[in-house]
């Protein structure tokens, strides 16, 4: 890509756990979407959640003749329970929360824009600028600090839920800073930040030692990227006892960089969670990731970013742009033409290719929407064709 990377420059990404207030909101939104898709694969869903103190407000729009078949309030309580908020001392308690259902119906104007009368095609559910990205930092084609930041929190979550570290509580964040060489290769970790909610009786010394030795170090498989100069900031604010929605209000769609590529790629601003696949903010972002990942895996570029733009009610994207550090304009045009001619970028085409009418969304929304190989947009089934047509 057209980035200037100085030798020994540091790049940083952050992640949040499933117990972070914004992530609680995302999970409730996507759990509601999944439950709707189980009873109506064509349901139109735009679900937003705000969570503060011991109150959950569920808003947005759902269009389905069987909307009343799901219990939105019970879905929210079950998500909060599964995360581990089982005691008000943790900042939230599924047993005592108040849940307000303020979900309405989707606008008839929007429905008419998406579903054209007498046509089987779908228009885009909204306008939007969407980006997909991949790089060769890791085997999952994600930025190294971003992948590590998420892996650290996943490890912590597993140890918390298994009871191996009983004093951990659900809310946490991480941040990883890596040093890159002049060829944009990650060479070592400069700094790791972990802020993790905890029981009030745990000492800072024990917390630091446990998080470094039992969570961080076992997570990092390549020990060569750690050295004596790596610094650790473990709960740098001091105590982190007051957490969850008691400490910070949560809102759907507020962690768009942690959801995508950790700041390594551009972002159009549209969040993913709570939206069915007619909303191109989500579905086209998954498709753009699929294309970018296959391009990098095919050896076209070390990193690849694809921009798509849509207009509401219009089937095809109104613009397509690639950014891949390719200095040959003719070759760049060839790549762009290949994308246009080989990938169906309409909402219908994306939904069919990526199987987006399935109730898969709750699994997508924690620890990043990308890099999870169970999903269709992570498959590398286009690599051979790309290499045959485009590889120099």
Swiss-Prot record:
Protein name: S-adenosylmethionine synthase
Record carries keyword Plastid: no
Family: Belongs to the AdoMet synthase family.
Entry's cofactor comment: Binds 2 divalent ions per subunit. Binds 1 potassium ion per subunit.
Chain residues that bind L-methionine: 61, 106, 248, 279
Enzyme Commission number(s): 2.5.1.6
Name of the gene this protein is made from: metK
Major site of localization recorded for this protein: cytoplasm
Catalyzed chemical reaction(s): L-methionine + ATP + H2O = S-adenosyl-L-methionine + phosphate + diphosphate
Region of interest (Flexible loop), ranges: 106-116
Pathway: Amino-acid biosynthesis; S-adenosyl-L-methionine biosynthesis; S-adenosyl-L-methionine from L-methionine: step 1/1
HAMAP family: S_AdoMet_synth1
Cellular compartments annotated: Cytoplasm
Organism: Borreliella afzelii (strain PKo) (Borrelia afzelii)
GO molecular function ontology, one term from the record: methionine adenosyltransferase activity
Pfam families: S-AdoMet_synt_C, S-AdoMet_synt_M, S-AdoMet_synt_N
């Amino acid at each position: 890509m057209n980035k200037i990377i100085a030798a020994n420059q540091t790049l940083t990404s952050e992640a949040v756990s499933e117990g972070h207030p914004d992530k609680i909101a995302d999970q409730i939104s996507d759990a509601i979407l999944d439950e709707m898709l189980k009873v109506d694969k064509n349901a139109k869903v735009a679900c937003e959640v705000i969570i503060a103190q011991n109150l959950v407000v569920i808003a947005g729009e759902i269009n389905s003749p069987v909307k009343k078949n799901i219990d939105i309030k019970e879905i929210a309580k079950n998500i909060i329970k599964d995360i581990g908020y089982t005691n008000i001392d943790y900042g939230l308690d599924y047993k005592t929360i108040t849940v307000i259902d303020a979900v309405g119906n989707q606008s008839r104007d929007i429905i008419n824009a998406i579903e054209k009368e007498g046509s089987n095609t779908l228009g885009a559910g909204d306008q939007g600028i969407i980006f997909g990205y991949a790089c060769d930092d890791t085997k999952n084609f994600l930025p190294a600090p971003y992948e590590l930041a998420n892996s650290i929190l996943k490890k912590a979550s597993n140890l918390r839920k298994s009871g191996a570290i009983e004093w951990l509580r659900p809310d946490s964040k991480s941040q990883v800073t890596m040093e890159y060489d002049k060829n944009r290769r990650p060479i070592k970790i400069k700094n790791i930040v972990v802020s993790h909610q905890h029981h009030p009786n745990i000492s800072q010394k024990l917390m630091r030692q446990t998080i470094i030795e039992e969570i961080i170090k076992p997570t990092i498989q390549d020990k060569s990227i750690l050295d004596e100069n790596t610094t650790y900031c473990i709960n740098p604010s001091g105590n982190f006892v007051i957490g969850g929605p008691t400490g910070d209000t949560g809102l759907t769609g507020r962690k768009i960089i942690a959801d995508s590529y950790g700041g390594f790629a551009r972002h159009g601003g549209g969040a993913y969670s709570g939206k069915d696949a007619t909303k191109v903010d989500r579905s086209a972002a998954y498709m753009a990731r699929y294309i970018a990942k296959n391009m990098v895996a095919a050896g076209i570029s070390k990193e690849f970013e694809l921009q798509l733009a849509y207009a509401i009610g219009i089937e095809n994207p109104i613009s397509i742009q690639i950014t891949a550090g390719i200095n040959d304009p003719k070759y760049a045009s060839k790549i762009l033409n290949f994308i246009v001619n080989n990938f169906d970028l309409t909402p219908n085409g994306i939904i069919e290719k990526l199987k987006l009418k399935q109730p898969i969304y709750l699994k997508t929304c924690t620890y990043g929407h990308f890099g999870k190989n169970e999903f269709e947009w992570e498959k590398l089934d286009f690599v051979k064709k790309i290499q045959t047509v485009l590889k120099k």
